[in-house]
Amino acid sequence: MDATPMQDAPPADYYSDGSDGLVYGTDENGNKIHHIETVIRNNATREQLLADPLFVANDTTYVVYSNYRRMYGQQPQDANERITINGNMTMDFGPLRLKLGTQAYDYEGNSYSWSRVYGGTDGSFVNEADFTMGYLNARYTISPLSYVKASLSQQTYETTSGNENYLNDIEAYGRRTKTWGSPNYYKRDRTGFNPVAPDEFFGVAGYGSQYTSFDTRKTTTNTISFDYTNQIGYNELKLGASIDNHEITRYGLGASGVARAIAQVDTDLDGLASEQEIIDYAGVDGAKDWRFINYRSLYVTNLGYNIYGDEWSGQYNQDDHMLAPAEPTQSRFYIQDKLEFKDVVVQLGVSYETIDTGAMAPDSDNDGYGDSDGFNNLYFNRQRVNRNGDGNGNYVWKKVKKETATHPRIGVSFPVSDRTVFRANYGTHWQSVPMSYLYLSDSQLSADILAGNATASENPALKPERSTQYEIGIEQRIGAFASLKVEGFYKESKDYLTLANRTEAFTNTGGADTQQNWAQYQNGDVMVSQGLTTNFEMRRTRGLYAQANYTYSEARGTGSYGSQNFYITWIGTDDGYPKAMNLLDYDQTHTANIILDWRSPDATGALANTGFNAVMSFGSGTRYTPSQIYSTVFENRWEFPEGPVNSGTMPAYSNLDLRVDRAISLGGLTANAYISVFNALDSEQVNDVYHGTGNVAEDGWVATESGQQWLANRLSQNPDVDAAAMYQDNLAFPGRWNRPRTVRVGLNISF
């Protein structure tokens, strides 16, 4: 690519005849491929150009793309680096054993974007992440039949992603610069696609386009656990407790909008928005909330920050939506008894568990706790959510109630013969919904309701997802070294996430109600899964360990994931939500795995310290809903179903991974040399299909009447250009497949 400013401006319909001195790539028919864009010199505004009597055509820079060609090999902007440190130390004090350990890593990586490789790679995505963990495990032996275990741990994970050139400098994301060679010299306000050449139609991100979003998150988790075990006659008694406490912060926004807002008022072009410039632009009254309103429109998510990215000050503030970090706590206490009689083993257990998210929600019934119904009536002033309410005790936000549950577990096993054992288990379980669905920032809620766009808001009052599971099966010993297990299972789950409109919601401002209609995550979906699983296992014999398993299953429910109803809520009604139990997106009828691991039993010889591992996996296709054929390139619209929900099946999946390794000694250090081959058979592994055809790389539109008409028009205009093939290029982008055969050669060194 040659992006040097040309001295003479060519005409708008400029097409190279090869005499301009630039080198152009050619397509398979010999046609030159190029792309021209215009960028105003020194990034002057249109108004400045019109007011400049000396403005001439040469004040426009023409960015000329040359050497466009198909390339294969390593993907640009797809590198990553990770440095990991592990360490542990064990101390033995007789009955007391202690183990100290730590792990840490530092990561930085880019993400390949097929649409940016022609001109937008200078402003690509980058992610930086850090993880640290430390733990102390202790075990104290009380007697030969009893012991106590305790554990303390802390881990912190922090990740930041954004534009690789600026990352944390949010105002720089959208700011044009005048320094030649700087990343934002050719900054584009819009990053939409542009034709690569006049005789082609598929688009790429134009030169100067920048990654425009910023996001940073940090989670610190402290865990303490205690377990006691004692064998008393026929009883193996266990009891214990654990507490997990988290602190979660996050901040994210469409960062390029900050500089764009400043540019609206920046009359002296110093890159700043002074108080006087804001007053001149918005008036005295408008200036008071100018900054807030501009940030709110960027759909800021803030937790432990205010809307501007300032860290938690210790006090909630409605003016700038300062919010405290999230501090959820989960605790569990359990007691279990395993009764071992001559002909039967019975396991009885019960756990008492709590989930306290610490999240805030409006209190609709004045019982002192926030609840989901409270979101039907919210108090606003100055276009802001006000968690303090109207000053008369109404619309006040309070902490949601702590969730508690008692979960029984029962297991029974007894021998049918000297080689066969029957087993049956029953238990109830729960899990908190993902934290990302629980914590709602005021700025995002304000934008979701007032901006009028189709959105999906988090819900601090979501309840945990609950399930009840039954298992029954047998285990058969085969010879002296192998066993076969056959087990049937049935699982019912409820309170899964769903998305629904609040059609009877109101916002109150100064005593006046305004009806709103907005979508929020709620509990509601149900799921049932059932199936049969078999597992064959052979203990290591002459160095060989083998395992094979197969599962037949079916998963049905009213929704596969929380946002599945997004298009229904977009319509704005309260009708059309799924009520029937359909096959779920992740329903997979057949899955199977085979593991072979051989470790040389010889201490000396050619194969000493050598190992071989093979893992083969197979899965029948997951589900999708067949839909009408349309152009996924030209038409930006919803899919219209052509069959029952999830009645289509994606292609089956198969994979074979191989690894050979050998331990060697290097000057007193222990090293392990290895060769790993992933997807050794180079099987096609499909991530998604076009729902009109069930094909990974073909949406079926070119074969339709409208597609054929388009193709005829293209061929009449450019008979030497294979329009059908170029349309296909827009469909068959790399992310639709999993990785091809990949070989890694490495060396692990331990010291």
PLM feature spans:
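Signature of Gram-negative outer-membrane beta-barrel scaffolds
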Residues: Y72, P76, Y211, K238-S417, ...
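Transmembrane beta-barrel strands of outer-membrane/channel proteins
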Residues: M1-A3, L100-A104, A150-Q154, L239-N245, ...
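Hydrophobic, lipid-facing positions within transmembrane beta-strands of outer-membrane proteins
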Residues: E81-G87, D130-L136, L152, T220-F226, ...
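Transmembrane beta-barrel wall of Gram-negative outer-membrane proteins
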Residues: M1-E108, V126-V148, S351, P408
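Membrane-embedded beta-barrel scaffold of Gram-negative outer-membrane proteins
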Residues: K149-S153, P415, V421-R423, G427, ...
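Short loop/turn motifs that connect adjacent beta-strands in outer-membrane beta-barrel proteins
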Residues: D92-P95, S143-Y147, Q231-E236, R419, ...
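Gram-negative outer-membrane beta-barrel transporters
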Residues: F489-E492, L497-R623, N748
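C-terminal beta-signal and adjacent terminal beta-strands/loops
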Residues: A9, V23, A603-N609, N613-R637, ...
